[in-house]
Structure formats: C-alpha cells, structure tokens
Amino acid sequence: MGGTELMMEKLISELGEDVLKTFQIIPSRVRELDENKIRVLWCHDLPQDPESHHLKNGGWRNFHKIVFCSHWQQQRYLEEYGIPWDRTCVMKNAIDPIDVDLDKKFNTEKDSIRFVYHTTPHRGLALLVPVFDKLCEQYTNIHLDVFSSFKIYGWDKRDEQFQELFDQIENHENMTYHGFVPNQEIKEHLKNADVFAYPNIWPETSCISLMEAMSAGCLCIHPNYAALYETASNWTFMYNYIEDYNKHANFFYNMMEQSIHVLNEKSDSLKIKLKGQKSYADLYYNWEVRKNEWSDLLKSLEHLPRPIEKDTTEEIFTYKVG
C-alpha cells in the first residue's frame, strides 16, 4: 500500500469502523458519493491531477469538508478551484514514532555511514545514484540502501522504465537495492540508517518518508520543494530547490559530502539537533495526536444535514469595512 492507503487504513483503525456509519471519508479518489452520509474528501494528490478535476465548476460543493495534508497543498487547491477557506482544513499525515535510542545510535562506532532512499523512484532516485557513485570514488566507508518500487501501488509495470537504474544499484558494491518491502521493515532499517538522501524532483503534498526519517534520528538532506519545507519545519539539512537537474545533482553532491564530514565529527550540536528533530516529529506527527484532531473534526460535522444546503449560519455580529 502507498502512503494514501496506509493513512486511510490507520485512520479507521484509530477511530473505529463505526465512524463509517455516519461519515463517508474519501481518500483522494472519488468513485461514488453516499448522499446518506456526511462526506469528507481527504486530498493527497496535486490539484492538477485528473482525479481532482471533479472539483471544478463548484464540484467542491458535494463535500461537507475537504481535508488537505499540508498548508502548501491546501492553498494550491483553493487557488485552482475557488474553494472557500472555511470549507477546508489541514490534517497533517502521521506516523507511529520510531523507537530508537539516539544516544546509542549516535555514539556507536560503525564501519560505514548508511544512506537510505525509501520512496518511489520517480521522485529523485535518478539524481541520487550517480551522485552516490561519484562520492564512492573518494569515500569507501559509505553505503546506500534503496527501498524503491511502484509495486507499493500495484503498478509493477512502471518499474520497467527504472530497471537500468535498479541494475546499476544492484551491481554496485556500495549500494543495495531492496525493491519493495513492507513499511515495518523499512522502519526497522531506519533505526540504523544515518542519512535520508532525498534529492526530490517531484512536488510532494506531504512526505511520510521524511517524517519517518526524522523520527528515526536520520540526518535528512532534501530541497525546499513543494510541501517538504513544511514537513521538515527547519529541523533538517534543507537546501533551495534547483530546476536544472545537472546543477541540482552537483549541489546535492556537496550536501552529501558535507553530511559525511558532519557525521564523522560527531559534534554535540548535531546530536542536539537530531534529538530535537526526533522530538518534533514524534510529537507533531504522532497518530495519538492526529487521532484526536480527526475525532474533533468529525464531531464538529455531525450536526450537518446530509443534503448540503446553502450556508445559513447566523452571524454573531456584522463586520463593516470602511
């Protein structure tokens, strides 16, 4: 399952199946609407995605509430479809915090610095692999683990265009290609990973991979592209996005090299930063917190009539401009 499916499955497991007796919570892809329930559209896609075009021409009125997974995403949908702000809200994606002793992880002597990439290949793997290959010419004590496949969505054929890249990883002594594995296995691997290397080139509306890496205490290298800056909240090794892929790769090389030096120094300041990063991710992206926020949201919608009527909310006062 991909991120959207994982979020939906987790949400229902946290709130309980009974919530679906009253609410129709639709994760991104609308197939049919249940007029007998309160309808909540939970968007994970980009506004330009064809699956979102049903919101055109007032299509957003079919939903009692439209939920977005980042403020970046919310504002783009509002601009694209003219949706009123008060018809929407933001509920960040969430994770179960990764249980790892950062003092032990930080101070343990290792034979190599472990880099990891654990998202689909089209998001930046083609930039990462040649950069890492070049780094290996100068640094022998580094290793890259790649967990990347469209099989996570059941789209096996889409892997074919990246097969040459996968082969390059498999044939490199300092890289390991793991393909598709269950999310729990990735989280276990993150406990021993040092760097989440993510030269992202695809606009993310949210990034669960980054949340997990932050929780695992990994040094995270990525651009400030789309919603990544919002997810990172200034805790990571973030850089300004570069459209030119060649320039991007060269800049990312420097960031990767810097991370090697920083990790080898084992400075107290880095340790404090990574601990703060983990604390932030564990608190702010925690399912225990998000479950309560979702529960409060749904309770606030319970009174709404199933057929969506024109807003007749009684105003407390009249605000006059000028």
PLM regions and their residue ranges:
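N-terminal pre-catalytic "stem/leader" segment of glycosyltransferase-like enzymes
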Residues: 1-33
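A charged, aromatic-enriched C-terminal amphipathic alpha-helix characteristic of glycosyltransferases
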Residues: 3-6, 267-308
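Donor nucleotide-sugar binding/catalytic pocket of nucleotide-sugar-dependent glycosyltransferases
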Residues: 64-78, 83-100
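Conserved donor-binding/catalytic core segment of Leloir-type glycosyltransferases
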Residues: 106-124, 129-132, 136, 145
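Nucleotide-activated donor-binding/catalytic signature segment of Leloir-type glycosyltransferases, i.e.
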Residues: 159-184
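Acidic donor-binding loop of glycosyltransferase active sites
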Residues: 191-205, 218
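Short hydrophobic beta-strand element within catalytic cores of glycosyltransferases
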Residues: 219-222, 229
